[in-house]
Amino acid sequence: MTTIVSVRRGRQVALGGDGQVTLGAVVAKASARKVRRLYHDKVLAGFAGGTADAFTLFERFEAKLEKHQGHLLRSAVELAKDWRTDRILRRLEAMLVVADHEATLIITGAGDVIEPEQGLAAIGSGGAYAQAAARALLENTNLGPAETVAKALTIAGDICIYTNQVHVIEQLD
């Protein structure tokens, strides 16, 4: 598993993830890139779950963004519909967090599209730890989104054995 967290302050949004990939009880890779920029660098996306499944979803989501001229919510809903109804896609085990200047969304394998409260989203094995840390930081500091994401990932990595301290963080200003 992994940890992906997204934090929003105003129109600024940051999304980050750790780099650990495990195969059973073994760390197979420590520096995987689970966070990407999509649609002309206007959308951030991160995944938790099976790597091959996530890349399939990234490709599908990017195609939806192109089809709908970068409209995040419409693209997410269309991906979720496909994910829920397509027999092959239904078997994919991954979740996505996607964000642009206007919204942050969680897209699940069950076909749910969720806009989290407070501009804060977290998924993966360390997601609850990262979410709690980010929420405390948002409420009690003036850190920017990228700094908040970095600190939340560090805390999650200290607690969750499936999350490491190799971080990739992207921000939209």
UniProtKB/Swiss-Prot annotation:
<keyword id="KW-0021">Allosteric enzyme</keyword>
<feature type="active site">
    <location>
        <position position="2"/>
    </location>
</feature>
<dbReference type="InterPro" id="IPR001353">
    <property type="entry name" value="Proteasome_sua/b"/>
</dbReference>
<dbReference type="InterPro" id="IPR022281">
    <property type="entry name" value="ATP-dep_Prtase_HsIV_su"/>
</dbReference>
<feature type="binding site">
    <location>
        <position position="160"/>
    </location>
    <ligand>
        <name>Na(+)</name>
    </ligand>
</feature>
<dbReference type="GO" id="GO:0005839">
    <property type="term" value="C:proteasome core complex"/>
</dbReference>
<comment type="function">
    <text>Protease subunit of a proteasome-like degradation complex believed to be a general protein degrading machinery.</text>
</comment>
<dbReference type="GO" id="GO:0051603">
    <property type="term" value="P:proteolysis involved in protein catabolic process"/>
</dbReference>
<protein>
    <recommendedName>
        <fullName>ATP-dependent protease subunit HslV</fullName>
        <ecNumber>3.4.25.2</ecNumber>
    </recommendedName>
</protein>
<dbReference type="GO" id="GO:0009376">
    <property type="term" value="C:HslUV protease complex"/>
</dbReference>
<dbReference type="GO" id="GO:0004298">
    <property type="term" value="F:threonine-type endopeptidase activity"/>
</dbReference>
<keyword id="KW-0479">Metal-binding</keyword>
<dbReference type="InterPro" id="IPR023333">
    <property type="entry name" value="Proteasome_suB-type"/>
</dbReference>
<comment type="similarity">
    <text>Belongs to the peptidase T1B family. HslV subfamily.</text>
</comment>
<keyword id="KW-0915">Sodium</keyword>
<keyword id="KW-0378">Hydrolase</keyword>
<dbReference type="InterPro" id="IPR029055">
    <property type="entry name" value="Ntn_hydrolases_N"/>
</dbReference>
<keyword id="KW-0645">Protease</keyword>
<feature type="binding site">
    <location>
        <position position="157"/>
    </location>
    <ligand>
        <name>Na(+)</name>
    </ligand>
</feature>
<feature type="binding site">
    <location>
        <position position="163"/>
    </location>
    <ligand>
        <name>Na(+)</name>
    </ligand>
</feature>
<keyword id="KW-0963">Cytoplasm</keyword>
<dbReference type="GO" id="GO:0046872">
    <property type="term" value="F:metal ion binding"/>
</dbReference>
<comment type="subunit">
    <text>A double ring-shaped homohexamer of HslV is capped on each side by a ring-shaped HslU homohexamer. The assembly of the HslU/HslV complex is dependent on binding of ATP.</text>
</comment>
<dbReference type="Pfam" id="PF00227">
    <property type="entry name" value="Proteasome"/>
</dbReference>
<keyword id="KW-0888">Threonine protease</keyword>
